[in-house]
Amino acid sequence: MLTLQWPADVIESGSMRRFIPWLIAAACAADVLSARAQAFPPPVGDSARRGYTPADVHFMSGMIYHHTQAIQIAGWAASHDAGPSVRTLCERIVAAQTDEIALLSRWLATRHEAVPQPDPAHMMMPEMNATHIMPGMLSAEQLAQLDRTRGPDFDALFLRLMIQHHQGAITMVNQLFASGAGEEEPVYKMASSVYADQTTEIERMQQMLAADIFAPTTPK
């Protein structure tokens, strides 16, 4: 377990409460990664020669749609008056998942597979193609509800919905490995990275909600 030291003036000022979720998440990160490695040991043998499967293509393509929606709603932080801690989280989500979309797209392109080009605007529409709805993705109604909120209300609802979204990504990884796919090394590494990152961020968001660092208003 990681041990982190905080300056005495931060603790005495009472501002330490704001950092509790991040402190706990950082301390748990090493344990999460260790558990992840035990849950899905790396493939044995020359995985590069095993080739990829249709399930791998479905996972890599689906994750592009999944990440695109996460980037979309995380990008609302500034315009929807999110608090500092939520903005920091959103910035990390946008940066990390933008990089992963580039890797996912490159993997598909080099194998001459179709590379999805999702339009975030279409994700707000109820008639969005059901084949593009991955586990945990927000419905058009949920997106519209989040888009209507501002400030602390946005923060609280964003965290709850992003936890749902991240849990869906973990489900996608579990389904990939349960099907016997994910043997090709790049696919395995991507799936493992998604699992570890999203698990850590779920822990972080749950702690942020539990710490009650914002006070949602009650509609009149």
What are these regions (language model features)?
Residues 37-220:
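All-alpha RGS (Regulator of G-protein Signaling) helical domain and cognate RGS-like helical scaffolds
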Residues 5-8, 22, 117:
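Generic low-complexity segments that are intrinsically disordered, proline-rich and/or Lys/Arg-biased
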Residues 17, 32-36:
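N-terminal twin-arginine translocation
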Residues 22-31:
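Bacterial N-terminal signal peptides
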Residues 13-23:
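Bacterial N-terminal signal peptides that target proteins for export
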Residues 3-15:
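Short, Lys/Arg-enriched N-terminal segments with co-localized hydrophobic residues
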Residues 5-8, 27, 52:
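Short linear motifs centered on Gly/Pro in flexible linkers and helix caps
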